[in-house]
Every structure is written in C-alpha cells, then in structure tokens.
C-alpha cells in the first residue's frame, strides 16, 4: 500500500486536527518558517512524530508567508538559498525534504531552479526528496544520487500537462480539490493500482506515497479511512 504523507505544523503548536492526523500517517512534512510554522511548532511536531514513529521531511518553501508559499516569487538565488538554510536549520538529523506549494510546482518545470535546489540538497546532506515523478526535479535529483519518493495526491484533481503527464489542477480552477471522502478513496484505488483516470483517459502513474493536505476539509476522515483499509 502507498505510504500516507501529510503536511503538518502549518497552523501552530498543538493544532487539534494536526495532532490527530499523526496517528494515521507514515510521513510528516513539517513546516519550517518559509510559508508557515516556526521553530516552536517545528520542534513540537518533530517530537510528536518521533514518539509516533513517523518519518519526517522538512517542508521547504519560498519565503512567503503572506501568500502561504503558493505564489512564485522573484528572488535572488543567494537570498533563496539562505532562506532554505534558515528553514532547514530548524531540524537536526533530518535528511529528507518535500518542497511546498509554488516551489514544488516550479521545481518540476524549471530546470535551472531544480539544479540550484539539488545542489543545495547535496550540500545540506539531504538524500531523499518527496516530489512528482514526472518533473525535472525528480529526473535531475536521481541523476545526482538522491532518492525520490514518487508522490501523488489523493484529494486533488488531475489534468494532463503539455507532455501528457498527470499534474494537479491549479487551485482556484474547477475540480482542483476533492471534497468527498468517497471520491478521494476511488482516486486512491486507482493510484494504488498504478494509474489515474484523467477526463476519461487512463494514464500510468506509479507512486510511492500519497499526500493529504492537513487543511483539506476531509483530511482527518480520509486519513482514517485509508489507514483502516
């Protein structure tokens, strides 16, 4: 079965839903101050995940709390890398990263940014990334010896990109978010069997882990349903 990953620590310390989600997931992507979170919230969720034997990734983002890291921002490479350092410094002994939001999407289509990011990962002793299997980030990171956990999304709708590969529908567009547990479970069944139906077209999609966004209206109920399959 696919591993369940979830973004945590984006709403402060001891958030009721986040605390409950820890019981049902395999991987926690912990916010570290770029788009949300703080040293205190990161420490809190690291400790909680360790107690529950949950794998931890640093949820690295553009430094843009105003837009929750969901917009591509113009930023000099040096300043961006310094922000990555500051975010990652909140953790000790963590060697896995999942990019967040706009950074995640941009890394999968911008080869220059992907090379910059992978170079930073190598210099920071990061040896594992959670990302789409179809983007340039996965391809380049693998060529540099970084392990890729291929990710799919269970409560987000999919469309096809210019290369006929599955990509999540951008937020704000019709069918971008799945707000029914039943529909999300049907999508999980497809992904668990190595494909996804996009507008009636069956597309191969091999993934290792599925993401549940903690701020989804169905996050907790969906995580519980998946865990008890």
Task: Give names to the regions the model predicted.
Residues 13-18, 36-48, 108-116, 133-144:
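Active-site-adjacent beta->alpha loops and helix N-cap segments on the catalytic face
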Residues 28-35, 67-81, 111, 163-178:
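Glycine-rich tight-turn/loop motif centered on a GG-T
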Residues 19-23, 42-57, 92:
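Acidic (Asp/Glu)-rich catalytic clusters
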Residues 64-99:
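Glycine/small-residue-rich loop that forms an oxyanion/phosphate-binding "nest" at active or ligand-binding sites
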Residues 2-8, 28-30, 56-60, 95-99, ...:
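Hydrophobic faces of well-ordered beta-strands that scaffold small-molecule active sites
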Residues 135-192:
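Active-site rim beta-loop-alpha module in soluble metabolic enzymes
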Residues 29-35, 80, 106-107, 124-134:
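Catalytic beta/alpha-barrel core
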Residues 167-229:
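C-terminal alpha-helical cap/extension of soluble enzyme domains
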């Amino acid at each position: 079965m696919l591993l369940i990953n979830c973004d945590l620590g984006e709403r402060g310390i001891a958030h009721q839903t986040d605390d409950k989600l820890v019981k049902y997931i395999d991987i926690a992507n912990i916010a570290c101050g770029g788009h949300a979170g703080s040293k205190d919230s990161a420490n809190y969720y690291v400790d909680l995940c360790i107690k529950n034997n949950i794998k931890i990734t640093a949820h690295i983002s553009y430094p843009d709390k105003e837009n929750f890291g969901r917009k591509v921002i113009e930023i000099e490479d040096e300043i961006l890398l310094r922000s990555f350092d500051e975010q990652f410094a909140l953790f000790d002994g963590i060697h896995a990263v999942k990019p967040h939001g706009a950074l995640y999407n941009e890394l999968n289509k911008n080869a220059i940014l992907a090379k910059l990011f992978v170079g930073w990962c190598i210099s920071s002793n990061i040896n594992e990334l959670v990302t789409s299997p179809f983007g340039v980030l996965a391809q380049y990171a693998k060529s540099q010896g970084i392990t890729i956990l291929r990710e799919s999304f269970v409560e987000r709708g999919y469309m096809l990109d210019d290369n006929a590969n599955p990509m999540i529908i951008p937020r704000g567009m019709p069918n971008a978010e799945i707000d029914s547990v039943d529909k999300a479970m049907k999508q999980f069944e497809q992904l668990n069997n190595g494909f996804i139906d996009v507008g009636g077209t069956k597309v191969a999609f091999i993934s290792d882990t599925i993401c549940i966004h903690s701020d989804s209206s169905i996050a907790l109920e969906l995580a519980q349903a998946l865990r008890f399959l």
